[in-house]
Amino acid sequence: MNLQNNVLNQIHQILLPTNPTLDKPNAEATKEEFSSAENRDEKDYLTNQQPKNLSTPSTSSNGEFIPHIFYSLHQIRKDPNNLSNQLETLTGSIRHRLKLCKSLISENEDTKDLLSKSPSEWQDIIHQREQELQIKRDVLDDLYRKLQR
């Protein structure tokens, strides 16, 4: 996916599942690019929020949200009295990633504007921009022909 908005790129990287070749979540790789102390604290928090259950598959601890939530519910159903099998504990990393995305969105007005539009509005905007590009192409073609004469 090619996103031109920097904040949307960051959100996209945070929400991506674990990169299997690096054996660490893309969210951590994205956070390593930031230099502020606040982001380093968030990375430490994210690391501390990972489930400590060794029987959890590695893809579910940092992977996509839905499989992670279903696995957490399965663990709770399997052993409801185990303190480490609480939904809050097992889904802590998901909540943290979503809060991080929410804060990124709330801090940037351009991102709010982009995300506030409906798909039908985007179709209209895309169509309008395609028309503008076609007009610009036509003008450039006319200029090129005039230069060739």
UniProtKB/Swiss-Prot annotation:
Say if the entry is tagged with keyword Nucleus. yes
GO: which molecular function terms? structural molecule activity; transcription coactivator activity
User: CDD domains per the record?
Assistant: Med9-C
Q: Which domain of life is it from?
A: Eukaryota
What subcellular compartments does it reside in? Nucleus
Query: What is the first-listed, main subcellular location in coarse terms?
Result: nucleus
User: A single GO BP annotation from the record?
Assistant: negative regulation of transcription by RNA polymerase II
Q: Name one GO cellular component term.
A: core mediator complex
Q: Where is the composition biased (Polar residues)?
A: 46-63
Q: Where is this region: Disordered?
A: 18-64
Q: Which UniProt keywords apply?
A: Activator, Nucleus, Transcription, Transcription regulation
- Locus of motif Nuclear localization signal: 77-99, 136-149
Residue spans of biased composition, Basic and acidic residues class: 25-45
Q: What does this protein do?
A: Component of the Mediator complex, a coactivator involved in the regulated transcription of nearly all RNA polymerase II-dependent genes. Mediator functions as a bridge to convey information from gene-specific regulatory proteins to the basal RNA polymerase II transcription machinery. The Mediator complex, having a compact conformation in its free form, is recruited to promoters by direct interactions with regulatory proteins and serves for the assembly of a functional preinitiation complex with RNA polymerase II and the general transcription factors.
The record describes its quaternary structure and partners as: Component of the Mediator complex, which is composed of at least 21 subunits that form three structurally distinct submodules. The Mediator head module contains MED6, MED8, MED11, SRB4/MED17, SRB5/MED18, ROX3/MED19, SRB2/MED20 and SRB6/MED22, the middle module contains MED1, MED4, NUT1/MED5, MED7, CSE2/MED9, NUT2/MED10, SRB7/MED21 and SOH1/MED31, and the tail module contains MED2, PGD1/MED3, RGR1/MED14, GAL11/MED15 and SIN4/MED16. The head and the middle modules interact directly with RNA polymerase II, whereas the elongated tail module interacts with gene-specific regulatory proteins.
Misc remark: Present with 1364 molecules/cell in log phase SD medium.
Q: Which family does it belong to?
A: Belongs to the Mediator complex subunit 9 family.
Output this protein's name. Answer: Mediator of RNA polymerase II transcription subunit 9
Organism encoding this protein: Saccharomyces cerevisiae (strain ATCC 204508 / S288c)
**Source taxonomy:** Eukaryota, Fungi, Dikarya, Ascomycota, Saccharomycotina
